[in-house]
Amino acid sequence: MPIYKMDKKKDGVQKYRVRINYTDSKGEAHQMDRVAYGLAEAKELEARLIFELNNKSNSSKMTLQELSEEYFNAKKHEVRETTLDKSRRLLNSNVLSLLGEVRLDKLDAKRLQKWKNEISEKDFKLKTRQNIYGDFRSMLNYAVKMEYIPKNPLLTVGNFKDSYDFTTPQDKLHYYTPEQYLKFSAVARDSARSVKEWGYFAFFAIAFYTGARKGEINALKWSDIEGTTMHIRRSVAQKIKGKDIVETPPKNKSSYRDIVIPQPLMTILEEHKARQKAMPGFSEDYRVCGGIECLRDTSIENKNKAFAKAAGLPHIRIHDFRHSHASLLCNEGINIQEIARRLGHSKIEMTWNTYSHLYPREEERAVQILNQIK
């Protein structure tokens, strides 16, 4: 790694060329040339370039497991704890379990395509596979940002696609019609023989009549209800490793919202609150559905299955009560912007892409209007 004296000078100061020869992780030879003025500056430049190359070489020998630890430590200051925990679980189960010991400089397209094929063979929905890819891509983008690798090799193999999935969005959407919900609700009410059981009855009523998310409903306190208005200001998560229940902000800025409570739900909440008030230590800080503590996700799902079975209804997910709320409003022709607002969607396109097929067909009415122009 010599320093060459050049013919040219600048203001009487000798000009030097610093030349560094090195081999990259693929075994290819490279040469780096830099110019310095004065022998002291040239030696300093040489030392710095050697240090940077060695540091870069060592970084490229970092394993994916080691990278993930640094990545998660950096991300914890940028995203919500629940988001980070979900990303960690996805990467641990589907990336690090397969590639954790692979060095960054050995992570090539062939190895990544093999990984992608393995994930494709798992019984995952397309969205889940794409979420895994997205988190993996984000981690490798971090490696590029930190100059551990020159480019993201995952981009070469591309995201997951499902060319055999011809199911339309409406075929995938599950929800209860108003008639089905009333059957479900009747069973839930009949089983509500205690204050806690009433909490489950109230939970499903809130889900259907407001379209709120599970975590938002579970986080609700009586202080969040003023008259006939429900204020969505927080959420709770129950799947963060090493923790019980964590209260978090809502999913996004649009999720902070006020929802007018319809009368059927208001009647249920008033009766439920009267029952809770009889409990020792009641306060406005009580959770609407759980009282002192939030209802457990597993318990909510168990009740959901039991009520559906008793009512002779197909089982739908907790999140599908949100779809039930939205589908009812769509079928009644409610403006898509209002539905997006009630659901707390950050983009109206999300609401439209999910529910537009539920709107009443306007073709016949459009033709009638045009037929009048003669």
State where each predicted segment sits:
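C-terminal catalytic core of tyrosine-transesterase DNA break-rejoin enzymes
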Residues: 145, 201-216, 303-308, 322-346, ...
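Conserved tyrosine-mediated DNA breakage-rejoining catalytic core shared by Y-recombinases
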Residues: 158-159, 219-274
